[in-house]
Amino acid sequence: MASSSSNRQFSHRNANTFLTYPKCPENPEIACQMIWELVVRWIPKYILCAREAHKDGSLHLHALLQTEKPVRISDSRFFDINGFHPNIQSAKSVNRVRDYILKEPLAVFERGTFIPRKSPFLGKSDSEVKEKKPSKDEIMRDIISHATSKAEYLSMIQKELPFDWSTKLQYFEYSANKLFPEIQEEFTNPHPPSSPDLLCNESINDWLQPNIFQVSPEAYMLLQPTCYTLEDAISDLQWMDSVSSHQMKDQESRASTSSAQQEPENLLGPEA
């Protein structure tokens, strides 16, 4: 099977974006500058990049991006840098995301001024809005709009809804198969036609020898004790082939292919 492909449009719309670049050794400062330039149209306010190490020693990169206007993209490759593709999520709680990024960094780079959740530039002040925990519907809506593969979809559900993932995994796998169906590989003929020989004789012979019963002169000599030489065996086999071929032709010539069969002649009965 080929890699899976989504049957719906990727969508990201948020002023707070959380990016994770797996197995990415890029310098955080360089990554920050590249991401900053990508979102100039949405007026970037703050970006934080941190490089961390996996248990196996490989490096990955986390980034928190804040813009004055919500970033609106439908291209899942929009935030790719130097060939590295990130996992893109909405940062529902920028404070927790920032703390998570800064937990064990090997290298960090920041640009701009961090804006806590529900700050005035987003339209409401801290006193007007209380932090609200997102509902399961909101979490799933965000996962569906951001996941770009079956594995990523299930991984995001496991992270955001661990209890539901552990008790309803078969349902999530079903929805993952619907969102990211497997692409059937196009059939490739192992024996493409060639000119002037349109058949691959080697492959036909490889199949012919073990699958079609053939009597060799040597085998015939073993079955016929009165046949003493190879020439006699070849002569007998040629004679049998000729006789059987003529018999087949005679049978075909006598066979009727007409639907109108000849009726028997009506004989006169005895005179009264």
From Swiss-Prot:
> What EC designation does it have?
3.1.21.-
Q: State what this protein does.
A: Implicated in enhancement of V-sense gene expression. Acts a an inhibitor of C-sense gene transcription.
Could you tell me which residues belong to the region Oligomerization?
A: 175-187
Motif RCR-1, which positions?
Answer: 18-21
Q: Which family does it belong to?
A: Belongs to the geminiviridae Rep protein family.
- UniProt KW DNA-binding keyword: yes
| Composition-biased stretches (Polar residues) | 254-264
The record's subcellular location field reads:
Host nucleus; Host cytoplasm
GO biological process: what's one of them?
rolling circle single-stranded viral DNA replication
Q: What is its main location?
A: host cell
Per the annotation, the residue ranges of the short sequence motif LXCXE motif, interaction with host RBR1 are: 198-202
Q: What is this protein called?
A: Replication-associated protein A
Q: Which GO terms describe its cellular component?
A: host cell cytoplasm; host cell nucleus
Short motif RCR-3, span: 100-103
Q: Which InterPro entries match?
A: CRESS_DNA_REP (IPR049912), Gemini_AL1_MSV (IPR001146), Gemini_AL1_REP (IPR001191), Gemini_AL1_REP_central (IPR022692)
Top-level taxon of origin: Viruses
